[in-house]
């Protein structure tokens, strides 16, 4: 399903100014939950759905309109090829990998039908701090999770060791100077989706001003 652009953007944005409480959206946000990649299965999104998901994902805060991020979509047999190469790298680090860990390394990119790499291209800028650019890439990752959910798929945001090992970057299509913000795994699941503990507001919120 492609995302259509409004014929009259000005009229569309006028509607945003008049937004009302969206109970369905609130209900979704109240239970939004990642699903472990190893619990994912087919089907995953097809190319048209992926493009729709990406169209939604780029609608994030982006100071200076720099778009300091890009995407790499991993699909099909290439995922298994990447897994075999990652296994070789892991065995170079640790020749005594257990059978269980060999399977883990080999299936890093085949647990989910689709994996989307979010690459941070943050760079020094005369006006925009690099930290803000990096946070924009993080916002893209969260938007990807939710856009995938909106299309009926489960999702998870992972990094894992190869996100920080530049020896793996050529294999993954990551250029010199770039960093991995995350690998978003997308698919279906046959497992029950269960809640996990969340922080109590009093532990993470402070207030300044206001009487109510």
Protein language model annotation of sequence segments:
Residues 172-196:
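A glycine-rich helix N-cap at a beta->alpha junction
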Residues 28, 115-117, 183-185, 206:
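Conserved hydrophobic/aromatic beta-strand scaffold that supports enzyme active sites
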Residues 195-212:
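Phosphate/diphosphate-binding glycine-rich loops and adjacent basic-rich segments that engage nucleotide
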Residues 77-81, 88, 122-124, 166, ...:
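Short, charged/polar surface micro-motifs in flexible loops or helix N-caps
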Residues 57, 116, 122-170:
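Small-aliphatic-rich amphipathic alpha-helix that forms the alpha element of a beta-alpha
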Residues 2-111, 212:
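N-terminal amphipathic, basic helical "cap/leader" segment at the start of enzyme domains
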Residues 63-66, 108-110, 172-177, 197-198:
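Solvent-exposed alpha-helices and their adjacent loops that cap or buttress functional pockets
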């Amino acid at each position: 399903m492609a995302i259509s652009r409004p014929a009259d953007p000005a009229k569309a944005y006028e509607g945003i100014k008049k937004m009302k409480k969206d109970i369905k959206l609130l209900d979704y946000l109240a239970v939004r939950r990642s699903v472990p990649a190893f619990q994912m299965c087919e089907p995953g999104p097809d190319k048209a759905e992926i493009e729709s998901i990406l169209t939604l994902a780029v609608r994030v805060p982006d100071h200076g309109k720099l778009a300091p991020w890009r995407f790499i979509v991993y699909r099909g047999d290439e995922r298994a090829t990447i897994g075999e190469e990652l296994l070789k790298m892991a065995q170079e680090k640790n020749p005594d990998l257990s059978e269980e860990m060999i399977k883990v390394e080999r299936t890093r990119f085949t647990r989910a039908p689709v994996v989307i790499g979010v690459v941070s291209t943050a760079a020094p800028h005369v006006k925009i701090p690099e930290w803000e650019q990096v946070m924009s890439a993080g916002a893209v990752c969260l938007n990807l999770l939710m856009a995938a959910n909106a299309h009926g798929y489960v999702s998870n945001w992972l990094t894992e060791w190869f996100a920080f090992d530049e020896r793996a970057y050529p294999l993954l299509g990551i250029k010199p100077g770039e960093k991995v913000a995350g690998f978003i795994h997308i698919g279906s699941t046959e497992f029950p989706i269960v809640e996990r503990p969340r922080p109590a507001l009093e532990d993470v919120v402070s207030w300044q001003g206001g009487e109510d």
